[in-house]
Amino acid sequence: MAFKFKTFAAVGALIGSLALVGCGQDEKDPNHIKVGVIVGAEQQVAEVAQKVAKDKYGLDVELVTFNDYVLPNEALSKGDIDANAFQHKPYLDQQLKDRGYKLVAVGNTFVYPIAGYSKKIKSLDELQDGSQVAVPNDPTNLGRSLLLLQKVGLIKLKDGVGLLPTVLDVVENPKNLKIVELEAPQLPRSLDDAQIALAVINTTYASQIGLTPAKDGIFVEDKESPYVNLIVTREDNKDAENVKKFVQAYQSDEVYEAANKVFNGGAVKGW
């Protein structure tokens, strides 16, 4: 009986080893990749990249959707996904600094301009003294929004603040605006809040309620923006064949046409 037990144990160990090897091979399959994207319009664009990847490169792209900007990098860092496509460089740089992720950009996608939207006013001339203006609360998009508010003359920031100013850097506020920081996904809903006169919203979230910068924005970030979105992976995965194939598929004419259709001309090619 002891001999039989050892034999079965050895066979079990061998099967377990083979299973582990099989899993490792699947994870490194050059013809499969898991990519994190934000649900909504960017997901629609990624679905076109998914089709191009399959048709042109034989790559099976599994899209994993997220509802916020925090989880996609966390999932990537943990190895739950192989890449993500949702963030611009200033945001990635801040995440690397704050969280210590070993992530790297491997390709550009698009610039999706942010814009100021309102259901209360139609021009900045109508913005009343003391109005509440909603902006995203993550450091990079907060800074991006404040820089845009400065560009349209609503506030003035301290010199030399770079791309990451905060409300503490506001040195002039002629209309005594109250800057309200909210989670980015909440910004579209804030337009229905009686207290919010204006909201600065990323195109990704604005598009979820049918808003586009060119058509609906009271003011819009220009096309010279440094906030080009990226395809990001782990540092130890940057040379993987499936990552290279996905970048090639995303940077295609088909995806560019789809992005401009989905965002009504609001997508600027970044490659």
UniProtKB/Swiss-Prot annotation:
PROSITE patterns: PROKAR_LIPOPROTEIN. GO terms for cellular component: ATP-binding cassette (ABC) transporter complex, substrate-binding subunit-containing; membrane; methionine-importing ABC transporter complex; outer membrane-bounded periplasmic space; plasma membrane. Pfam families: Lipoprotein_9. It comes from the Bacteria. Keywords: Amino-acid transport, Cell membrane, Lipoprotein, Membrane, Palmitate, Signal, Transport. It is a lipid-anchor. A lipid is attached at C23 (N-palmitoyl cysteine). A lipid is attached at C23 (S-diacylglycerol cysteine). It is found in: Cell membrane. GO terms for biological process: D-methionine transmembrane transport; methionine import across plasma membrane; methionine transport. Residues 1-22 form the signal peptide. This protein is a component of a D-methionine permease, a binding protein-dependent, ATP-driven transport system. The MetNIQ system is also to be able to transport the toxic methionine analog alpha-methyl-methionine. Belongs to the NlpA lipoprotein family. This is D-methionine-binding lipoprotein MetQ.
